[in-house]
Regions:
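Noncatalytic luminal/extracellular "stalk/propeptide" segments of secretory-pathway proteins
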Residues: 1-96
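A conserved hydrophobic secondary-structure block that centers on an alpha-helix together
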Residues: 74-130
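Molybdopterin (Moco) oxidoreductase catalytic core of the xanthine/aldehyde oxidoreductase family
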Residues: 121-145
């Protein structure tokens, strides 16, 4: 980003002022930068509301993507066996999935299962930036095409609890109607107006860009060395 290159300019100036030897390496990389994200929640008989959200690195884009919101209850069950995992992902097809699972493996398997999108809950009420890539950084040429680019956002803990309760209430109402033998006559959950629907809007800047990185060298008395590395970028202030 422009801010990232400005940070490199600053570091280079400081290195020069200190008389430290350095090289500024230029390269091209596949950059994924979240731009904007929101989740609008809809349920018959209740006013629509928008949940504050942030997209993850390597999320796909979504523009008015709408689908039934389902709660991934299995994400709270700990380690699952193969059959349990199959049953879990079978329920995701054509749905927007609400979950606490923020792993890349889950994201990848949810995409394979036909999920429309993922709304992940970060347990705390502070935004947590994440990546839906296999590593932090640019994917290798072999990995890049494996990324599903499924629309993915994270929401705050308190909003997640609210959505979980809404989805559970809708599912409980469906169970009651089914017990009365009404389900067959009325059709799907959505037809009864019991389903919670989510609309995902995600804007991303996923493209190849030119970037640079400073590498400073402070020589010692022997060929042995200590490699120090760290982030100089920041999502907000830094």
């Amino acid at each position: 980003s422009e801010a990232g290159e400005a940070a490199v300019d600053y570091l280079v100036q400081e290195l020069e002022a200190a008389g430290i030897e350095y090289e500024r390496h230029y390269y091209e990389l596949m950059r994924s930068l979240p731009v904007q994200a929101s989740v609008t929640v809809k349920k018959a008989g209740e006013p629509d509301f928008t949940v504050e959200a942030i997209a993850a690195v390597y999320s796909g884009e979504a523009h008015g993507l709408t689908g039934e919101l389902v709660w991934d209850e299995m994400c709270t069950k700990g380690q699952l066996n193969g059959l349990e995992q199959e049953e879990r992902f079978r329920t995701f097809k054509g749905k927007i999935v609400l979950t606490y699972d923020i792993s890349f493996l889950f994201y990848y398997e949810a995409a394979r299962a036909g999920a429309l999108g993922i709304v992940a809950i970060w347990p705390k009420d502070i935004h947590h930036h994440d990546t839906m890539g296999g590593v932090w950084g640019m994917p290798g040429s072999r990995d890049r095409d494996l990324y599903p680019y499924l629309p993915y956002v994270q929401i705050l803990g308190q909003d997640g609890l609210k959505l979980i309760e809404m989805v559970k209430a809708g599912a409980a109402a469906v169970g009651t109607e089914a017990a009365k033998g009404v389900e067959a006559a009325m059709g799907t959950v959505a037809a009864k107006g019991m389903a919670v629907t989510a609309q995902m809007d995600v804007a991303m800047d996923n493209r190849i860009v030119r970037s640079s990185m400073p590498v400073a060298t402070i020589p010692g008395k022997s060929e042995s060395f200590v490699l120090l590395s760290g982030h100089y970028d920041s999502w907000y202030e830094g």
